[in-house]
């Protein structure tokens, strides 16, 4: 007769409230989606959100409104952790860049600096072929 294995309770890591007043908002805006990650100055993630994670699907993910909603959701969680001011670094060519920055300011976070960190090749890889529609 086989012995029954005792059920072990799965341990879930409880989110502890970090007290971080200054942070960095990394906004990655592509042609398909916008991802907003808010970190502490060392780069440890405090909160994140994206247009896709909020339920936007397909071409709606790439809209400025979806980027605005993603930035608001990430900012709300960051403010619960005590964040007051931000430095914003924006990467990518997408439509949601400015909308995400504006919504971060509208939530009550103080934006100290905005920098564009879009990678620009010094004639590196060959780009994809031109689309013919």
UniProtKB/Swiss-Prot annotation:
Biological process (GO), any one: translation
GO CC terms in record: ribonucleoprotein complex; ribosome
Pfam families reported in the protein's UniProt record: Ribosomal_S11
Keywords assigned: Ribonucleoprotein, Ribosomal protein, RNA-binding, rRNA-binding
Family annotation (SUPFAM superfamilies): Translational machinery components
Gene Ontology MF, one: rRNA binding
Domain of life where this protein originates: Bacteria
The family this protein is said to belong to: Belongs to the universal ribosomal protein uS11 family.
Complexes and interactors: Part of the 30S ribosomal subunit. Interacts with proteins S7 and S18. Binds to IF-3.
UniProt function note: Located on the platform of the 30S subunit, it bridges several disparate RNA helices of the 16S rRNA. Forms part of the Shine-Dalgarno cleft in the 70S ribosome.
Protein name listed in UniProt: Small ribosomal subunit protein uS11
Organism: Brevibacillus brevis (strain 47 / JCM 6285 / NBRC 100599)
Name of the gene this protein is made from: rpsK
């Amino acid at each position: 007769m086989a012995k029954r294995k005792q059920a072990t309770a799965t341990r879930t890591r409880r989110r502890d409230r970090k007290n971080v007043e200054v942070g960095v908002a990394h906004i990655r805006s592509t042609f398909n989606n916008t991802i907003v990650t808010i970190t502490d100055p060392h780069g440890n993630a405090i909160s994140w959100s994206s247009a896709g994670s909020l339920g936007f699907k397909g071409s709606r993910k790439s809209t400025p409104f979806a980027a605005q909603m993603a930035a608001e959701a990430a900012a709300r969680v960051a403010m619960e952790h005590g964040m007051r001011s931000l430095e914003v670094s924006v990467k990518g060519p997408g439509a949601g860049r400015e909308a995400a920055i504006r919504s971060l300011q509208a939530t009550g976070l103080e934006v100290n600096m905005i920098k564009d960190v879009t990678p620009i090749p010094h004639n590196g890889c060959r780009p994809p072929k031109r689309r013919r529609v």
